[in-house]
Amino acid sequence: MAKAKLVNSPSVVGGVDTHKDLHVAAVVDQNNRVLGSEFFATTRQGYRQMLAWMASFGTVERIGIECTGSYGAGLLRYLQSAEIEVLEVTAPDKMERRKRGKSDTIDAESAAHAAFSRIRTVTPKTRSGMIEALRVLKVCRKTAVAARRIALQMIQMNIVSAPDELRDQIRHLTRMQLIRTLAAWRPDVTAYRNVQDAYRIALKSLARRYLELHDEIADLDVMITSIVDELAPELIRRKAVGYECASQLLITAGDNPQRLTSESGFAALCGVSPVPVSSGKTNRHRLNRGGDRAANSALHIIAIGRLRTDTKTQEYVAKRVAEGHSKMEALRCLKRYISREVYTLLRNQNRQINSTQITT
């Protein structure tokens, strides 16, 4: 579908407040005046109707959308396929909200105003490539790991409170021996009113759940490893960079890392860029507590790994400490350097992938 454009028509900018079942759209003209607002269903037909409605006011130059990673993901993909420029609207205008209050229509108009002025907006992730697939698999793995941990905790708690004769049979086993032994039990399921049989039934159920989740995690690890190897082979070869950290950094950068215009922007996204807090004669910086904390954690793990095994990293931290910095301050500087290294690798790899696709 080509970009919505009418001959000799005025330019308009759209804004969308996204929800689960209905999106609220608004349109502003070349002077940032509201032309109208409307509700649309969160279906492909609804997306088509929304774009046609916006185009009825003029040429749609761009559209600002809230929550492109959740409720607005489907609309984002549709508009990108229609070659419409999309901006993600971040935080609402607090001053405007205090004056006008809050409603879905007001939020849609605010998104349109933000897109018109290009304030409180960022370039959204495309969410249509392999990194989006990686993100979905990683989220699935994370929940499976959490569920497996809970299953193991419940097994251990039940064993602690189980009858002595039952507990004595399994207390000497290692973790996997215990899990496989419990999963192989054949309790009498008709005797569930008996305490000991009820414990056997519960422990067998928990053990089988643990093993199923264990196999599920192993399958997901194979898929995640394959994607990371394909997307970031150079990154995974760097010291102390494992698949868990590499996958998280890829997800943070997104399928279109070119939206990050500088390595300092990537550092800010990862929360490793120092924030200036200077005033008058005071000139200092503080720790950045914003950004993607999962990416920050990945950089921290890489830094700790290099600090333990890499001689150059150890020398760098020792030099910083000798200059009067604390070890934690030296570690923050190290994370900043690692983010620069990661940014360069991801940008170069993205250029290589794009070049290969164009050649093909």
Feature annotation, model-predicted:
Residues 80, 86-124, 132, 136, ...:
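Short alpha-helix plus adjacent loop in nuclease-associated cores
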Residues 322-360:
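Basic, amphipathic alpha-helical segments enriched in Lys/Arg and hydrophobic/aromatic residues
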Residues 59-71:
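Short glycine-rich phosphate-binding loop at a beta-alpha junction
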Residues 22-45:
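Short glycine-rich, Thr/Ser-proximal phosphate-binding strand/loop in the N-terminal lobe
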Residues 236-237, 243-327, 355, 360:
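Phosphate-backbone recognition surface of nucleic-acid-processing proteins
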